C-alpha cells in the first residue's frame, strides 16, 4: 500500500506544474522580426517642432493596406483626435491628406523601422546622448502582432531611430497632387 501511495505521490508531483506552465513561453520577444505583410500592421509617428510658436505638428499614420494618413498644422487635433481645447485660436489649423501607396512599400517602411529598433524596448533609455532638444518625435506601432507605444521623445532616447522616423515624416510631409 505504501509503495502505491509513493508512486501516486511522485506522479502527482511530476504532473502538478503542468497546468501552471501550459501556454507559457518566454516573456521576451525578439524585437528584430521579419515583418509579414498584413492589413493589421500600422505605425503612427508624431513630430513637433517646438522652436516656433505656435508649435508646428505633423502626424503620419501608415497602415498595412498602403493607406497613409498625414495631418499637419498647429492644432492639437493633429496629434490628438480627442483634444478638448476647441476655443484655442489654432483649433482649426489642420490639414489632412490621405495617400495610397503599394502595401509592399508600406511593409518595406515597417521593416526598415524594425531594423532600426522601433520594437526594441531594451534599446530606448540607454542612449548616452541625452540632449534636450526643441524637437519631439514619438512612435506607436503594431507590426506582426508586436507593439510599441511608449510616448517618449526619440530624439533624446534613440537619436538614430529618431532620424529614421523623421525621414518617414519628410517622405510624406508634402504630398504631390
Kindly label every feature range from the protein language model.
Residues 59, 96-98, 149:
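Well-ordered beta-strand positions in beta-sheet-rich domains
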Residues 52-92:
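Glycine-rich catalytic cores of cysteine/serine-nucleophile enzymes that process amide/ester linkages
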Residues 10-19:
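Bacterial N-terminal signal peptides
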Residues 64-65, 99-106, 141-146:
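A short, structured loop/turn motif at beta-sheet edges
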Residues 62, 109, 137-139:
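Residue-level detector of buried hydrophobic side-chain packing
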Amino acid at each position: 500500500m505504501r509503495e502505491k501511495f509513493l508512486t501516486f505521490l511522485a506522479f502527482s508531483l511530476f504532473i502538478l506544474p503542468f497546468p501552471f506552465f501550459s501556454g507559457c513561453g518566454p516573456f521576451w520577444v525578439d524585437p528584430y522580426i521579419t515583418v509579414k505583410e498584413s492589413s493589421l500592421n500600422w505605425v503612427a509617428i508624431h513630430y513637433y517642432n517646438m522652436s516656433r510658436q505656435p508649435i508646428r505638428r505633423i502626424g503620419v499614420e501608415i497602415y498595412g493596406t498602403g493607406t497613409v494618413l498625414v495631418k499637419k498644422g498647429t492644432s492639437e487635433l493633429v496629434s490628438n483626435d480627442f483634444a478638448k481645447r476647441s476655443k484655442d485660436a489654432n483649433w482649426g489649423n489642420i490639414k489632412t491628406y490621405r495617400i495610397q501607396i503599394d502595401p509592399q512599400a508600406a511593409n518595406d517602411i515597417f521593416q526598415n523601422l524594425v531594423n532600426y529598433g522601433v520594437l526594441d524596448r531594451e534599446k530606448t533609455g540607454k542612449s548616452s546622448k541625452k540632449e534636450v532638444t526643441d524637437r519631439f518625435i514619438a512612435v506607436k506601432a503594431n507590426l506582426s502582432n508586436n507593439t510599441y507605444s511608449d510616448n517618449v521623445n526619440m530624439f533624446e532616447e534613440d537619436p538614430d531611430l529618431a532620424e529614421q522616423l523623421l525621414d518617414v515624416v519628410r517622405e510624406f510631409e508634402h504630398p504631390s497632387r
